[in-house]
């Protein structure tokens, strides 16, 4: 159709659709909640467009009616997606976990920086547990959920780093102000930096509405300028003291960029992350080797070569950069367990083959332990091949088989024989590790 002859109502509908299209990515990637300002802004824009669409006169013409219907459906679809993003059960789960972290920080951390409390090991364990729970929140590959999870993780992990750095660091004692007049100023700045830590933590966790990131950045930059202007008269000890305080300020300043970092696509879309890609490449090769070993007619011939390569894969995983990202850390941890489990499987197979080739006299209890190890080897092969979840009948069957082997080992009386005791202990540990591995494989974790 000639654009110059296009009906004004069609032109208006196309204009509205372009306006709606321009905010589509903002809606798809919206990671907040329904009480956020940005939610209300997007909702207001889309609702306004719906009214605009409804006001277009179709003049009873079928083509205009169809165009208006399509425009309304597109806009309503985005409104629905916006609402679903903000109210998704896993988004609410992220919110609830974050609120737990807020309560913990408000109670334990902020008072620490005012000198009325201290950071305990219980707090550190609690914050680590919160981080682990966040990494296990399912996103289903949904951009808004990945973004919300990563956004929340960056804040809580930043608090964890600030606390750990402060607790771990053994700072130099403030120099005596008698040493040089500039020392008094450095001591004063150091006190302000300590206060700024508490303010920063409160800001990151949203437990202090009286401060802003911009103002705190100005305060820290001002303290930095004050230190730069000091004349230390070439005194090495004063220069080193000043440098320590400057480094502390720089560490705090980097956390003020977290909002921007959390909006970076490559930060939350871990499928594109180079560390995750490395981990996936290792896992791909490990799975190829696993399939080859489980299907091999003469596996003993593959043992040495396979174990050497698997150890090399462990080395590759050790070199993966964690980027201070708990999701990457968890992905690497699980990959290491995957590879180590296959190595353990090969070690047990080798031991069982060696026992067949070089039989020796064994006591009945020791022989009973070896029988269990033989059973565990067969079960472990099945567990390595397992790819379901915890509701699968096969999962329940494997879990029952492993529990049965543990009960059998519990019934073995080593009769005081140390060698048998050690073998039974090792077999129990192996059975428990296989159970843990089965649980890990079936928990449907994703990054």
UniProtKB/Swiss-Prot annotation:
Limits of the BAG domain: 9-86, 95-167, 182-260, 275-350, 365-442
GO molecular function terms noted in the UniProt entry: adenyl-nucleotide exchange factor activity; protein kinase binding; protein-folding chaperone binding; ubiquitin ligase inhibitor activity; ubiquitin protein ligase binding
UniProt cross-references to InterPro entries, sorted A to Z: BAG_chaperone_regulator, BAG_dom_sf, BAG_domain
Domain of life: Eukaryota
Keywords, alphabetical: Chaperone, Repeat
Pfam families, A to Z: BAG
Tissue specificity annotation: Detected in brain, lung, stomach, liver, kidney and testis.
Gene3D superfamilies noted in UniProt: BAG domain (1.20.58.120)
One cellular component (GO) term of this entry: mitochondrion
A GO biological process held by the record: protein stabilization
Assembly with partners or alone: Binds to the ATPase domain of HSP/HSP70 chaperones. Binds PRKN. Interacts with HSPA8 and JPH2.
Functional description taken from the UniProt entry: Co-chaperone for HSP/HSP70 proteins. It functions as a nucleotide-exchange factor promoting the release of ADP from HSP70, thereby activating HSP70-mediated protein refolding. Has an essential role in maintaining proteostasis at junctional membrane complexes (JMC), where it may function as a scaffold between the HSPA8 chaperone and JMC proteins enabling correct, HSPA8-dependent JMC protein folding. Inhibits both auto-ubiquitination of PRKN and ubiquitination of target proteins by PRKN.
Protein name: BAG family molecular chaperone regulator 5
Gene label: Bag5
């Amino acid at each position: 159709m000639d654009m110059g002859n296009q009906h004004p109502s069609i032109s208006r509908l196309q204009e509205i659709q372009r306006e709606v299209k321009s905010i589509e990515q903002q809606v798809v990637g919206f990671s907040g909640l329904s009480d956020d300002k940005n939610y209300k802004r997007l909702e207001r824009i889309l609702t306004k467009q719906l009214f605009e669409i409804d006001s277009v006169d179709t003049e009873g013409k079928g083509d205009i009616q169809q165009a208006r219907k399509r425009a309304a459906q597109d806009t309503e679809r985005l409104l629905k997606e916006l609402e679903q993003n903000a109210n998704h059960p896993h988004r609410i789960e992220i919110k609830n976990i974050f609120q737990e972290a807020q309560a913990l920080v408000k109670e334990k951390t902020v008072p620490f920086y005012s000198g009325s409390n201290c950071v305990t090991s219980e707090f550190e364990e609690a914050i680590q547990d919160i981080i682990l729970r966040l990494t296990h929140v399912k996103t289903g590959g949904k951009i808004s959920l990945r973004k919300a999870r990563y956004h929340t993780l960056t804040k809580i992990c930043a608090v964890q780093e600030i606390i750990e750095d402060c607790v771990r660091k053994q700072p130099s004692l403030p120099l005596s102000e008698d040493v040089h007049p500039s020392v008094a100023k450095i001591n004063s700045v150091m006190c302000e930096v300590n206060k700024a830590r508490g303010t920063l933590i409160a800001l990151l966790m949203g437990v202090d509405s009286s401060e802003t990131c911009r103002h705190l950045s100005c305060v820290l930059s001002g303290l930095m300028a004050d230190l730069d202007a000091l004349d230390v008269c070439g005194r090495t000890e004063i220069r080193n003291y000043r440098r320590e305080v400057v480094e502390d300020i720089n560490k705090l300043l980097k956390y003020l960029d977290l909002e921007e970092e959390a909006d970076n696509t490559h930060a939350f879309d871990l499928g594109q992350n180079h560390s995750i890609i490395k981990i996936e490449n290792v896992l791909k090769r490990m799975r190829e080797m696993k399939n080859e070993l489980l299907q091999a007619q003469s596996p003993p011939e593959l043992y040495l070569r396979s174990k050497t390569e698997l150890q090399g894969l462990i080395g590759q995983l050790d070199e993966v950069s964690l980027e201070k990202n708990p999701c990457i850390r968890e992905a690497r941890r699980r990959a290491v367990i995957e590879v180590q489990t296959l190595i353990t499987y090969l070690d047990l197979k080798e031991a069982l083959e060696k026992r067949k080739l070089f039989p020796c006299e064994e006591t009945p209890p020791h022989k009973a332990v070896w029988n269990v190890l033989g059973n565990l080897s067969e079960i472990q092969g099945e567990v390595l091949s397992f790819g379901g979840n915890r509701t699968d009948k096969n999962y329940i069957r494997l879990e029952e088989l492993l529990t049965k082997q543990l009960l059998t080992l519990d019934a073995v009386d080593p009769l005081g024989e140390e060698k048998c005791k050690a073998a039974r202990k090792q077999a129990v540990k192996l059975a428990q590790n296989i159970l843990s591995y089965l649980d890990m494989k079936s928990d449907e974790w994703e990054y």
